[in-house]
Structure formats: C-alpha cells, structure tokens
C-alpha cells in the first residue's frame, strides 16, 4: 500500500 512505501523510510 501507499503507507507501506513510507514505512520503508
């Protein structure tokens, strides 16, 4: 999901 992409940071 979009939020998962931010969690990588």
Swiss-Prot record:
* Keywords, alphabetical: Amidation, Neuropeptide, Secreted
Modified-residue entries (Phenylalanine amide), positions: 9
Single GO BP term: neuropeptide signaling pathway
A single GO CC term for this protein reads: extracellular region
What is this protein's tissue specificity according to the annotation? Detected in the thoracic perisympathetic organs in larvae, and the dorsal ganglionic sheath in adults (at protein level).
Q: Where in the cell is it found?
A: Secreted
Among its keywords, does the record have Protein transport?
Answer: no
Family statement drawn from the similarity comment of this UniProt entry: Belongs to the FARP (FMRFamide related peptide) family.
* Name of the molecule in the record: FMRFamide-1
Organism the protein comes from: Lucilia cuprina
